């Protein structure tokens, strides 16, 4: 028997089987129902298992409510607070190409340009939406410049939304409130940035940032713990190219200083910078006060003063 005939007969058998499962039970002709829990197709009349070990084509995860289902679903882009419309609106591509990558004609390009314009108008229909769009754009820009992770951007966006809902913006600039939200979110996430670093990437003055930050924290009741000098150490050590040993030694110095009350009333950035400089000397790694000053964005005088205070708390630091 040729291969062609064998394939033909196998195809006929397959078609017959599919026809039987579609038409009904092969024994009694009753209705066949699918038992998804057990992966079986069963006759509702006689109980014959027509098919078993069926393939579950549903998701591999489980959800117990609609909110959890939406969070786990991978259909469509996830919602995010970093966009003024939470990512729910439609975006029209600016590349002027069709689905196959071909360039659009002149008439089609003009049509798409008009559609984009109207789409953008509908996305920001009122002043509140325009305010939110501008602020979230500022938050994203500053977070990128500061190298902050996505969770900080999300938290900063939520804080700004709360400030907008509670009507805290009158009398204050959008940039000022947005900057204070980034500063607060970074501290809450344990990846703080100094006021000087924040001011370097912001469009408002340092004094306004500090003033607005205190106002937002007070009015919204945000829980922001005092900045820990140890949280600055990994970033400073990484930027200076120091080893893990030096980073660990710097944290030990700060813990000793904290136990002896050196932290009180001192800038956490200055203490962290001095500890990193001292740790580099202890581990025989080359660095200078000027390099540490540049990385930490703090004066060499402050580093020297904090260094000598750490020297009093830790007798092993070389002078």
UniProtKB/Swiss-Prot annotation:
Family, per entry: Belongs to the TFIIB family.
Name of the encoding gene: tfbF
Record carries keyword Transcription regulation: yes
Record keywords, A-Z: Metal-binding, Repeat, Transcription, Transcription regulation, Zinc, Zinc-finger
Annotated segments matching region Disordered: 1-33, 59-89
PANTHER family to which the protein is assigned, alphabetical: TRANSCRIPTION INITIATION FACTOR IIB (PTHR11618:SF13), TRANSCRIPTION INITIATION FACTOR IIB-RELATED (PTHR11618)
Any GO molecular function: DNA-binding transcription factor activity
A biological process from GO: transcription preinitiation complex assembly
Function: Stabilizes TBP binding to an archaeal box-A promoter. Also responsible for recruiting RNA polymerase II to the pre-initiation complex (DNA-TBP-TFIIB).
This protein's name: Transcription initiation factor IIB 6
Bias-annotated ranges (Basic and acidic residues): 1-16, 59-74
Gene source species: Halobacterium salinarum (strain ATCC 700922 / JCM 11081 / NRC-1)
Matching CDD domains: CYCLIN_TFIIB_archaea_like_rpt1
InterPro entries for this protein: Cyclin-like_dom, Cyclin-like_sf, TFIIB, TFIIB_arc, TFIIB_CS, TFIIB_cyclin, Znf_TFIIB
Pfam families to which the protein is assigned, alphabetical: TFIIB, Zn_Ribbon_TF
Placement of Sequence repeats on the sequence: 137-220, 231-312
Domain of life: Archaea
Zinc fingers, TFIIB-type class: 21-51
Chain positions recorded as Zn(2+) binding sites: 25, 28, 43, 46
One annotated Gene Ontology cellular component of this protein: transcription preinitiation complex
């Amino acid at each position: 028997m040729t291969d062609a005939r064998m394939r033909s007969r196998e195809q006929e058998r397959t078609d017959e089987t599919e026809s039987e499962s579609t038409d009904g039970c092969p024994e009694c002709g009753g209705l066949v129902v699918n038992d998804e829990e057990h992966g079986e197709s069963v006759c509702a009349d006689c109980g014959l298992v027509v098919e078993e070990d069926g393939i579950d084509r549903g998701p591999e995860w489980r959800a117990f409510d609609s909110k959890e289902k939406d969070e786990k679903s991978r259909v469509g882009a996830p919602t995010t607070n970093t966009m003024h419309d939470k990512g729910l609106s439609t975006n029209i591509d600016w590349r002027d190409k069709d689905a196959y990558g071909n360039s659009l004609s002149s008439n089609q390009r003009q049509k798409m340009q008009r559609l984009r314009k109207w789409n953008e108008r509908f996305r920001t229909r009122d002043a509140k939406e325009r305010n939110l769009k501008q602020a979230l754009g500022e938050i994203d820009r500053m977070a990128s410049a500061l190298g902050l992770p996505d969770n900080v951007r999300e938290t900063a966006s939520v804080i700004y939304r709360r400030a907008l809902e509670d009507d805290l913006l009158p009398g204050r600039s959008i940039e000022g409130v947005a900057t204070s939200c980034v500063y607060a979110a970074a501290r809450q996430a344990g990846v703080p940035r100094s006021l000087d670093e924040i001011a370097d990437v912001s469009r408002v003055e340092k004094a306004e940032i500090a003033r607005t930050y205190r106002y937002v924290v007070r009015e919204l009741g945000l829980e922001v713990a005092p900045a820990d000098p140890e949280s600055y150490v990994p970033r400073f050590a990484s930027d200076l190219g120091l080893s893990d040993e030096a980073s660990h030694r710097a944290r030990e110095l700060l813990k000793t200083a904290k136990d002896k009350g050196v932290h009180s009333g001192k800038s956490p950035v200055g203490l962290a910078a001095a500890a990193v400089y001292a740790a580099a000397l202890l581990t025989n790694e080359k660095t200078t006060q000027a390099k540490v000053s540049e990385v930490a964005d703090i004066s060499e005088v402050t580093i020297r003063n904090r260094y000598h205070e750490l020297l009093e708390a830790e007798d092993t630091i070389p002078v």
